[in-house]
């Protein structure tokens, strides 16, 4: 009686136990002792501990969708799927040739003519009125900006407004101011020699504290000033009625008429004296 109650409880607690047809198994029930009589044998057999691992190598039996891919394959090779069997989504857009390299630009006449035809085939495109408004807006803005571009050159800010005048000398021009002593020494040298030599030029530059270039330029300017003065005197003499050659470059101060050079009053009082030669013969 006690043993049967234990078996019923054991069957409820361990549903995995199975009855054996032979009834010779004594799993789950032990003996009470060595001298006592053993309990009656139960008709249950112990089930395997992990029934869900039974038949794990046989994957074909557990596949509910049909035959598997075969025997055990490499663990690094994923199963291949045949993508050709799956049809792609239906294309609603028209096919565009890939070799057409001249695609119409947005806002161009070709694009405006192409817009309605492509809109008829594509349901997600803009309406015709919207495309026309975009084209008109683009043309309006381009027309509004083009006159301003033509009026304002990108290099207009670089152009400097220069007032054209007859004067060539500017205020920013660097000018050397000679001292009175330097001018006096240069004038003395000019009266002695109108064209200075290289040796004398270097000596003057050292003595006066100037550069040879400054001495050379001073002599050039001094000769130009003298030519201007001579030309001015010649023009004044021609206006008074005299006739003198007007080329000042070929006239030296000794060739000018006596009207330009006044003789001192002391020299005027002298009269030429006739000197008679007397020859004495023995």
Swiss-Prot record:
Residues 171-230 bind DNA. Residues 13-36, 98-156 are annotated as: Disordered. One of its GO terms (biological process) is labyrinthine layer development. It comes from the Eukaryota. Signal peptide: none annotated. It is found in: Nucleus. InterPro entries: Caudal_activation_dom, Caudal_homeobox, HD, HD_metazoa, Homeobox_CS, Homeodomain-like_sf, HTH_motif. Residues 20-29 have a biased composition (Low complexity). GO terms for molecular function: DNA-binding transcription activator activity, RNA polymerase II-specific; RNA polymerase II cis-regulatory region sequence-specific DNA binding. The keyword Nucleotide-binding does not apply. Residues 110-124, 133-148 have a biased composition (Polar residues). Its main location: nucleus. Pfam families: Caudal_act, Homeodomain. GO terms for cellular component: nucleus. Keywords: Developmental protein, DNA-binding, Homeobox, Nucleus, Transcription, Transcription regulation. Belongs to the Caudal homeobox family. This is Homeobox protein CDX-4. It comes from Mus musculus (Mouse).
